[in-house]
Amino acid sequence: MIGSSHAVVALGLFTLYGHSAAAPAIGASNSQTIVTNGTSFALNGDNVSYRFHVNSSTGDLISDHFGGVVSGTIPSPVEPAVNGWVGMPGRIRREFPDQGRGDFRIPAVRIRESAGYTVSDLQYVSHEVIEGKYALPGLPATFGDAQDATTLVVHLYDNYSSVAADLSYSIFPKYDAIVRSVNVTNQGPGNITIEALASISIDFPYEDLDMVSLRGDWAREANVQRSKVQYGVQGFGSSTGYSSHLHNPFLAIVDPATTESQGEAWGFNLVYTGSFSAQVEKGSQGFTRALLGFNPDQLSWNLGPGETLTSPECVAVYSDKGLGSVSRKFHRLYRNHLMKSKFATSDRPVLLNSWEGVYFDYNQSSIETLAEESAALGVHLFVMDDGWFGDKYPRVSDNAGLGDWMPNPARFPDGLTPVVQDITNLTVNGTESTKLRFGIWVEPEMVNPNSTLYHEHPEWALHAGPYPRTERRNQLVLNLALPAVQDFIIDFMTNLLQDTGISYVKWDNNRGIHETPSPSTDHQYMLGLYRVFDTLTTRFPDVLWEGCASGGGRFDAGMLQYVPQIWTSDNTDAIDRITIQFGTSLAYPPSAMGAHLSAVPNAQTGRTVPFTFRAHVAMMGGSFGLELDPATVEGDEIVPELLALAEKVNPIILNGDLYRLRLPQDSQWPAALFVSQDGAQAVLFYFQVQPNVNHAVPWVRLQGLDPKADYTVDGDQTYSGATLMNLGLQYSFDTEYGSKVVFLERQ
């Protein structure tokens, strides 16, 4: 917890270049979402205040406060001394720090003029308040009407370079969320180059702070990393062309004493799928600056006269109740104001994916047999994975066929239509008339050199002039910056989905981007990809789309605009998945996680974990499925029971609030609780990863319940919410890998 001396500072800094001034009074309460008083601005949420003002002498925007609720007049800071090399701009908290005028910290924007200058002097011109939250051109964005959000746009202008910048601040008060983005427009006669652009820059007052991020690699995504913010620059990002497995575009700044359920935390999440940068700098004066936006190494964006570059959005969420509270605010906001799919909050079908069951080795007869066995298990959706396409270059391994999206005639002599019809005529076991649904795997952004498409259009693959085209997994990346490539993907996907009965698409992407012709290609690629997704998801709203980038490589808020679920990791080992899924939930709702029960020994780790444990871990994702050959399932008698349990918990997983009760990095007994929005139901997932010999299993205290209500636990004993939260529950486990799913219902 922050002590009282820190709390005074946190009330806000009101600083002018060269002198201090009395802070303006902006209303006596937070009754209005956005309040302006001349050139002072207040954004007010249920539990958050965001304040800044214009320096009347310089036109610069000065940060006053981002944190807990403040009202009325806020105190002025002590006037900073100006000594040494650091000028006044480097000694204050700035809203949109530019470069070249004495602030030696990381800038939010760096512009190179045609003459070579990189100095900017963006000054306040005007502002406007807009009801609701508007879309961004060509980019995914949060949305909301006048009841949900209010937007402040501050217009800046550089009189020397004729560059304009529009800073957008949208507040969703119910979620204590501020959403920021920037438009930079060249209003001059010559070309300019945007070398760096952050969607958000926050200068925190002097305090000791920690930073939290998600690091990893393929099959090892979303490991939580926490470290002390040191003097100097620290940070992370992606240069892979995508948000990537390596680092996720999520950052939290927290008080050192902050835990899951206590303390101040600020969460930042970029609504973007491309290369990004997240940087934190503690400057010489002790202020901490946090920036998220484009990766400057992969931008270099040319703007001709009249042209505009729009940054991705960054969502900033505040809570004084720990990281768990920040996560729940992200989850609610994204479910209601980012994810556009009709499936975002609706029950997901239990699925079986063919990949780990048969890999590339199948034909029409064997795939129909696999579907029949799936329906007999009680599965509702059968997904045919990689290996169904390619004529001259059949897809019988990963070294050929990508780009040739027609059924392999050797495997499907009559095409896919009769296969889909046969499978969707199967009745799901345990139902009277529910028919099995059919889904399919595609990897539209990729091409194998061994393909007809590549032989006809080698220029469509990303390449840098004469340099060799580096293959990964025997494939190259199509250049989605090209409209012709975008149209090709839209057209073949339309032909595949139109009138075929396919109701689910798994969209894969199994490598990073290499050999781009220019740094700006990365963002051009993303704009093309977003156009493709926007077109297809609008054209086929009844198709359930799943994003998959070799598992986890594009698990980001940008993708969630178009797809309601994402394959969380190619690692399906249940022990590893607990860590991956808990980490992913720092920013992203469990409803968006694809999680499957796979065969053992696990293909990635070689570990053997009990069937029930694997199932319980997978149930914590919004899309539960099986990734195995049904004929090899052990313990057939428990499969219908577990599938029924998965269907029972799914509505609470999709729309409930997640409480991470005990973290896998801290305990051998990780636990999570999901509480329905109305508080009437809850489901506890409790695991034992490794027992301690001759040691009691610890009690687990629940959270998020009504302390005055009574709850029935698994239809048996009844306890008060206060008892369950202050004392908790205790269970014993008979095996090394033990698990329990416990239902609670409010009386």
Swiss-Prot record:
It comes from the Eukaryota. Keywords: Glycoprotein, Glycosidase, Hydrolase, Magnesium, NAD, Signal. Glycans are attached at residues 37, 47, 55, 159, 183, 191, 363, 425, 429, 450. InterPro entries: Aldolase_TIM (IPR013785), Alpga-gal_N_sf (IPR038417), Alpha-glycosidase_related (IPR050985), Glyco_hydro_27/36_CS (IPR000111), Glyco_hydro_36 (IPR002252), Glyco_hydro_36_C (IPR031705), Glyco_hydro_36_N (IPR031704), Glyco_hydro_b (IPR013780). The keyword Magnesium applies. It catalyses: Hydrolysis of terminal, non-reducing alpha-D-galactose residues in alpha-D-galactosides, including galactose oligosaccharides, galactomannans and galactolipids. Pfam families: Glyco_hydro_36C, Glyco_hydro_36N, Melibiase. Its EC number is 3.2.1.22. Homotetramer. PANTHER family: ALPHA-GALACTOSIDASE C-RELATED, GLYCOSIDASE FAMILY 31. Involved in galactomannan degradation. This is Alpha-galactosidase C. The lineage of its organism: Eukaryota, Fungi, Dikarya, Ascomycota, Pezizomycotina.
